[in-house]
C-alpha cells in the first residue's frame, strides 16, 4: 500500500482521508486499551500481594513476650518458697488444739491431769491469784490493762486458757526432757520480750509443769 504521507502537490482523495482517519483513531483506541489493561493488571497484582501479606500476618501466632512470662515465674517461685517455709514457733503456740498430742503416754496423762486441776481444783484458783498479782505489779502495758479491767470470772477463765496453751507448748513431742523444755523456752524468748504478760504466764506454766519433765 502507498505511503499515507503524500507530496503536498498531490491532492488526497476524500475517501483516502477517511480511511487514514479511521485507521489512526483505531490505533489510538487500541493503544489506550492496552494501557488500561496493563494498569489494571498491575493494580490487581499489588492488591493480591497486600492481601496475602495481611492474611499471612494475621495467622502468625503471637508469642508472649519475656516480660509477660516473668510474673508467672515469680508466682511459681513464691508458691514453692511458701510451701517449704518452716512454721514459726509462735504459730504453733497459737494453735492450742494441735499441741501436746504427740507427748508420751505417761507425760500426756500427767499433762491432762494438771490441766484438769487448773480448771476444776484449788490449784487453778491459786494460779489465777498469782497471775493477777504479778500482772498488777508489772509495768503497765495495753495487754495488762485489758486483763486487769476484765470482769473477774472472765479474767480467771482467760488466764487459765493462756496457761493451758503454754503447758501444751512446753510439753510436746515423743518425750520431753529438760533440755527440750529449755530449748522451747529459748525459741519463744524473742516473742516473750515483746509480750510481758505472756512471759509471766509462761513462767507460771513452766513452774507447774516442771515435775512432768523427764530427766
Swiss-Prot record:
Cellular component annotations (GO), alphabetically ordered: host cell cytoplasm
What are the Polar residues biased-composition ranges?
A: 36-66
Name any Gene Ontology BP term.
symbiont-mediated suppression of host JAK-STAT cascade via inhibition of STAT2 activity
| Ranges for region Involved in self-degradation and in host STAT1 degradation | 15-22
Give the compositionally biased regions (Basic and acidic residues): 25-35
Query: Remarks, anything else?
Result: The C protein is found in virion at a ratio of approximately 40 molecules per virion, presumably associated with the nucleocapsid.
What is the official name of this protein in its record?
A: Protein C'
Amino acid at each position: 500500500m502507498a505511503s499515507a504521507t503524500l507530496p503536498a502537490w498531490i491532492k488526497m482523495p476524500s475517501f483516502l482521508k477517511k480511511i487514514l482517519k479511521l485507521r489512526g483513531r483505531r490505533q489510538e483506541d487500541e493503544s489506550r486499551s492496552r494501557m488500561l489493561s496493563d494498569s489494571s493488571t498491575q493494580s490487581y497484582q499489588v492488591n493480591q500481594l497486600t492481601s496475602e501479606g495481611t492474611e499471612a500476618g494475621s495467622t502468625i501466632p503471637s508469642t508472649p513476650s519475656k516480660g509477660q512470662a516473668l510474673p508467672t515465674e515469680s508466682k511459681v517461685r513464691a508458691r514453692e518458697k511458701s510451701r517449704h517455709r518452716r512454721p514459726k514457733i509462735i504459730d504453733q503456740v497459737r494453735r492450742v488444739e494441735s499441741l501436746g498430742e504427740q507427748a508420751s503416754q505417761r507425760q500426756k496423762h500427767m499433762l491432762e491431769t494438771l490441766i484438769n486441776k487448773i480448771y476444776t481444783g484449788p490449784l487453778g484458783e491459786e494460779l489465777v491469784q498469782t497471775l493477777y498479782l504479778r500482772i498488777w505489779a508489772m509495768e503497765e502495758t495495753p495487754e495488762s490493762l485489758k486483763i486487769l479491767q476484765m470482769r473477774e470470772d472472765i479474767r480467771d477463765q482467760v488466764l487459765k486458757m493462756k496457761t493451758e496453751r503454754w503447758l501444751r507448748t512446753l510439753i510436746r513431742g515423743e518425750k520431753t526432757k529438760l533440755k527440750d523444755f529449755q530449748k522451747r523456752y529459748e525459741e519463744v524468748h524473742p516473742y516473750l520480750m515483746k509480750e510481758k504478760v505472756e512471759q509471766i504466764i509462761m513462767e507460771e506454766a513452766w513452774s507447774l509443769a516442771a515435775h512432768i519433765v523427764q530427766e
